[in-house]
Amino acid sequence: MASNGVDEQIKLVEGPAGYVLEDVPHLSDYILDLPTYPNPLQSNAAYSVVRQYFVDEDDTVQEKIVVHKDSPRGTHFRRAGPRQKVYFKPSDVRACIVTCGGLCPGLNTVIREIVCGLHFMYGVTEVIGVDCGFRGFYSKNTVALTPKTVSDIHKRGGTILGTSRGGHDTSKIVDNIQDREINQVYIIGGDGTQKGANAIYKEIRRRGLKVAVAGIPKTIDNDIPVIDKSFGFDTAVEEAQRAINAAHVEATSVENGIGIVKLMGRYSGFIAMYATLASRDVDCCLIPESPFYLEGKGGLYEFIAKRLRENGHMVIVIAEGAGQDLVAESIEQQDASGNKLLKDVGLWMSLKIKEYFAKHNVMDITLKYIDPTYMIRAIPANASDNVYSTLLAQSAVHGAMAGYTGFVSGLVNGRHTYIPFNRITERQNKVVITDRMWARMLSSTNQPSFMNPPKGTTEFTD
């Protein structure tokens, strides 16, 4: 029997010394007298040697680990992992997986490990993949997924299920979940996708359905808050090195050579910052969070000329969302997911630098522009991201089988946790330019901060 309380997703449990647990919803919150079953892992020979494999219900993970001695204990999240009791009989489980939004290294690994985790750890045999994002739910496009069909997909880029932006119709999606008798839904996507997943969870709860909704957060830009990082990010940074290395070779092979590399980062410059730190060949890194200006004392043009006179070459890394206020009126258009369409700041920057140096007869330059954006996101995950994606997928499976719903699995301070949907969709994670990591990057490039444009120049307004 179902109870009311669709909006009761935020579950706060308070304890002594300022302890707060931001708990995730559970099927038992709105369905009474749910039966439980022994976890099949108890009889799984592979796990018989693992001591204390099951997670204690009281285990939580602290959100902030750097505190003062008198600070309150702060916010915690429920620790991820298998429980001794599960709320689904494996023979009754009919699970589905959907991928939405842009591509990202590791998508196929997550798909594979959800399928294999359900099958080998819990004995679930019915798993289907939903084709091409949310709209696949109501366009009748599905594919059967078995350990055999997904055995080597982690070696490929992209997603075997296809993906799309938009197409979210909550009522139609839940109607089809109900019609197909699906009782576990795994949704892989970014913040927009997880907002859609939250809407699906709420509608399922409103209808009183025994359906667990689990999210695996995905963004190559690493702009999802709370979690340590997104899967695919390490691969993206590693692959970005190839473009930066090529730009460095081009720049050093000619007199006054400039190499410009545009990397992904619509609103957050993490890929650009970490790729710059990893490369050590970059002279200037420009990201959306750090304003800059072009002309005048201390501007970008002056810095480029200075660096060329000193070294005879220069490499610039720019995130796709950097300097949009400097670009001629940005277009007021959005993609199907509601993301603002940006002008190509890398191409614009290349043209502006060429024009300035020619117009002012500063010096002859040779400029090469490299845009590896889609190459970076379309490759398979590296070893680190494959392991990370595996653990995220397995955590989601453990959570759904244990009856949790309306959550994403994520790494917080090195521990896998279950996080309420609202916590990862309420804001975007951004580079903090007053933080140590940005200072480390500045010390690597020795670039100016560009924070104080002189009078008479065009200022960047945040």
UniProtKB/Swiss-Prot annotation:
The modification Phosphoserine is found at residue 71. GO terms for biological process: fructose 6-phosphate metabolic process; glycolytic process. GO terms for molecular function: 6-phosphofructokinase activity; ATP binding; metal ion binding. ATP binds at residues 102, 165-166, 190-193. Expressed in roots, leaves, stems and flowers. It is found in: Cytoplasm. Its cofactor is Mg(2+). GO terms for cellular component: cytosol. Mg(2+) binds at residue 191. It catalyses: beta-D-fructose 6-phosphate + ATP = beta-D-fructose 1,6-bisphosphate + ADP + H(+). The record marks 192 as: Important for substrate specificity. Pathway: Carbohydrate degradation; glycolysis; D-glyceraldehyde 3-phosphate and glycerone phosphate from D-glucose: step 3/4. Pfam families: PFK. The modification N-acetylalanine is found at residue 2. The active site is at 221 (proton acceptor). Gene3D superfamilies: 3.40.50.450. InterPro entries: ATP_PFK (IPR022953), PFKA (IPR050929), Phosphofructokinase_dom (IPR000023), PKF_sf (IPR035966), PyroP-dep_PFK_TP0108 (IPR012004). Allosterically activated by AMP. Keywords: Acetylation, Allosteric enzyme, ATP-binding, Cytoplasm, Glycolysis, Kinase, Magnesium, Metal-binding, Nucleotide-binding, Phosphoprotein, Transferase. It comes from the Eukaryota. Substrate binds at residues 219-221, 264-266, 320, 374-377. HAMAP family: Phosphofructokinase_II_X (MF_01981). Catalyzes the phosphorylation of D-fructose 6-phosphate to fructose 1,6-bisphosphate by ATP, the first committing step of glycolysis. PANTHER family: ATP-DEPENDENT 6-PHOSPHOFRUCTOKINASE 1 (PTHR45770). Homotetramer. This is ATP-dependent 6-phosphofructokinase 6.
